[in-house]
């Protein structure tokens, strides 16, 4: 019976489609702000009415169950990037599922909280940086939703949302946490830390911080028309600083504890101060980016990307 209904044509089928679109349009978002916590931030304090949900996506399962709740009067979705217990390598993270799950929940803004190494003397462990640029040195990650008959090229000159980044930086100031309002985050594949030669080259290129995850998320968030900004929590000087021993996991964890506590304060303040409406261009990133004639896009591809491209399909 289900098979026959699926292949029905004519007015009945058209009415069903119209009804489905109508229901979809009326559906309220379960969250408008997404928080992706990195090393050291595996849960979000201060959430009320918190509950866990498992979100299924066309790209597989996210890193963990997503925690939904209310923070400072706004609906928030929290996801531990590496899974609770820190069990997923940077290269193993299902970035597409993580970002798509946020889109399915109605998230319009993603705040990333990530541990990074410093490549400059004046960027000290314990301080925060709100990155405004990324440099991608990852090797073999799936960093696009597109393909399979649909080509899109989104603008990525400015990879983070200026409005969201400004709110994050101001929140750091409000909480008396030293913050650097701009800088380039170089993203490496990992999981190994840099060699001394690599660190020196990165410094010569005048990058500010180094991490292993954020550029992939930023690319996917842009394709999903979600604002994205990073709180980069500095834990160490990588391996280049002559007066500091080479970076070790224990050194990072010690600083992470302090940074995680500070990040919770910043997140609460930032979420409270976020304007209800977006005035940036992130929400229309695909408007002039879809290259393929949508009439010839395979139905399977349209279905898989419905949450992202639905508003552009007539």
Q: Which residue stretches match the model-derived regions?
A:
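His/Asp/Glu-rich mid-to-C-terminal helical/loop segments that flank catalytic regions of hydrolases
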Residues: 239-286
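Generic non-transmembrane alpha-helical segments
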Residues: 163, 167-178, 265-273
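Non-catalytic positions within long, well-ordered alpha-helices that form the structural scaffold/packing
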Residues: 103-106, 203, 222
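Zn-dependent metallopeptidase/amidohydrolase metal-coordination segment
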Residues: 212-250
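Active-site/ligand-binding-proximal alpha/beta "capping" segment
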Residues: 174-208, 295
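Metabolite-binding pocket within alpha/beta catalytic cores that recognizes anionic/polar moieties
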Residues: 15-157, 313-314
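N-terminal amphipathic/basic-hydrophobic helices that include classical n-h-c signal peptides
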Residues: 1-20
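A short, charged, Gly/Pro-tolerant segment at domain boundaries
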Residues: 279-314
């Amino acid at each position: 019976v289900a098979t026959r209904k699926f292949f029905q044509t004519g007015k009945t089928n058209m009415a069903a489609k119209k009804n489905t679109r109508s229901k979809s349009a009326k559906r309220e978002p379960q969250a408008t702000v997404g928080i992706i916590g990195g090393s050291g931030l595996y849960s979000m304090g201060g959430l009320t009415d918190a509950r866990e949900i498992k979100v299924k996506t066309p790209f597989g399962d996210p890193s963990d169950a997503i925690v939904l709740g209310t923070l400072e009067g706004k609906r928030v979705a929290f996801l531990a990037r590496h899974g609770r217990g820190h069990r997923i390598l940077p290269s193993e993270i299902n970035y597409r599922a993580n970002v798509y799950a946020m889109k399915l929940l109605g998230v319009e803004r993603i705040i990333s909280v990530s541990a990074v190494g410093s490549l400059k003397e004046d960027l000290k462990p314990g301080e925060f940086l709100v990155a405004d640029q990324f440099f991608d040195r990852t090797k073999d990650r799936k960093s696009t939703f597109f393909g399979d008959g649909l080509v899109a090229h989104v603008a990525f000159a400015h990879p983070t949302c200026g409005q969201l980044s400004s709110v994050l930086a101001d929140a750091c100031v409000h909480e008396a946490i030293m913050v650097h309002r701009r800088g380039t985050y170089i993203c490496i594949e990992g999981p190994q830390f840099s060699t001394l030669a690599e660190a020196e080259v990165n410094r010569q290129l005048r990058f500010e911080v180094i991490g292993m995850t954020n550029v992939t998320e930023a690319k996917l968030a842009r394709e999903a028309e979600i604002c994205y900004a990073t709180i980069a929590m500095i834990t160490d000087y990588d391996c280049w600083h002559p007066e500091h021993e080479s970076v070790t996991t224990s050194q990072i964890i010690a600083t992470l504890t302090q940074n995680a506590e500070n990040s919770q304060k910043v997140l609460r303040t930032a979420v409270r101060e976020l304007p209800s409406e977006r005035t940036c261009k992130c929400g229309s990133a695909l408007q002039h980016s879809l290259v393929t004639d949508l009439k010839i896009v395979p139905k399977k591809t349209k279905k898989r990307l419905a949450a992202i491209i639905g508003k552009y399909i007539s």
